[in-house]
Amino acid sequence: LSSSKIVLVLGGVRSGKSRFGQDLAWELGGDDVLFVATAESRDDEMARRIENHRQDRPASWLTLEQPLGVGEAIASSAACRSLILLDCLTLLVSNVLLQHHDDFTAAEARMRAEIARLIETVQHRNMTLVVVSGEVGMGVVPESSLGRQFRDLLGWANQSLARHAAATYLMVAGIPVNVARIASTVTHAASDLRSTIETGVNA
């Protein structure tokens, strides 16, 4: 990894993001992994999903169930290990919005604090953080106000972590694509476009 110790794994529903995040955590951390789960068992279907994920993880991994206050919980956990797998950021955003459902400004402030604490914890501890998160910004505009707030807040959270990440992977049909490796900048994009416009040949 680079000087950053954060890895972000993005993907849509059933894209393979959780599986890739888990496999990556095993390759990097082996048995020395703390799995941080943000899901809450609100119904039978979610309870089954949580149990399936639990059975799918290595028995040697420790599990911390933390729907809110993730960064603070990791920082203060006596069980902290060399690699932290957070699955998933999507549900952390959802939990924050549900707690502040009538005050989006408060939800934004809480989420900014959550992300800042996560980054600060990784920077000051000898650990690697793998974060699994959903990419929900490529579909239709949600009909409800809460849906739009969720999309916007998760998009901001993903961008914030990606800016601090050593690598960001986008899962496409189970295939991990290292988007940071093929990323461009505004300066490079403008330069390529000028060349294309002037020569008529794609850069």
Spans of features found by a protein language model:
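Conserved P-loop
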Residues: 7-77
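Short, well-ordered beta-strand core segments
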Residues: 33, 84, 167-170
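Phosphate-binding P-loop
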Residues: 1-7
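Residue-level signal for inorganic ion chemistry
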Residues: 21, 53, 85, 134, ...
